[in-house]
Amino acid sequence: MPRSLKKGVFVDDHLLEKVLELNAKGEKRLIKTWSRRSTIVPEMVGHTIAVYNGKQHVPVYITENMVGHKLGEFAPTRTYRGHGKEAKATKKK
């Protein structure tokens, strides 16, 4: 079920404060965050946010197309290495 419009989007306060502070200064530097649940808002466009995937921080450059999505969508947590290969049969004489 979608979130109510009267509530607005969710962005962690500490992350939004950092973005607004950088916008006021006119700086564009890497912002580290563990908040995968935060929604991308228009104020974040042009920034690079390092989103934690459980192992490392994955740098994500925010574009206009990403607005409305969650930060966690762009930092995959699982690495798929393919299905297991069948063991080669040994040749017997």
From Swiss-Prot:
Record-level Gene Ontology MF annotations: rRNA binding; structural constituent of ribosome
Keyword Flavoprotein annotated: no
InterPro entries per the UniProt record, alphabetical: Ribosomal_uS19 (IPR002222), Ribosomal_uS19_bac-type (IPR005732), Ribosomal_uS19_CS (IPR020934), Ribosomal_uS19_SF (IPR023575)
GO terms for biological process, alphabetical: ribosomal small subunit assembly; translation
Gene Ontology cellular-component annotations: cytoplasm; small ribosomal subunit
Keywords: Ribonucleoprotein, Ribosomal protein, RNA-binding, rRNA-binding
PROSITE patterns from the UniProt entry: RIBOSOMAL_S19
Superkingdom in the source lineage: Bacteria
A Pfam family it matches: Ribosomal_S19
Tagged with keyword rRNA-binding: yes
NCBIfam families attached to this UniProt entry: rpsS_bact (TIGR01050)
Record's subunit section: Part of the 30S ribosomal subunit. Forms a loose dimer with protein S13.
Assigned protein family: Belongs to the universal ribosomal protein uS19 family.
PANTHER family in the cross-refs: RIBOSOMAL PROTEIN S19P FAMILY MEMBER, SMALL RIBOSOMAL SUBUNIT PROTEIN US19M
HAMAP family hit by this protein: Ribosomal_uS19 (MF_00531)
Its biological purpose: Located at the top of the head of the 30S subunit, extending towards the 50S subunit, which it may contact in the 70S complex. Contacts several RNA helices of the 16S rRNA.
Protein name (Swiss-Prot/TrEMBL): Small ribosomal subunit protein uS19
UniProt source species: Thermus thermophilus (strain ATCC 27634 / DSM 579 / HB8)
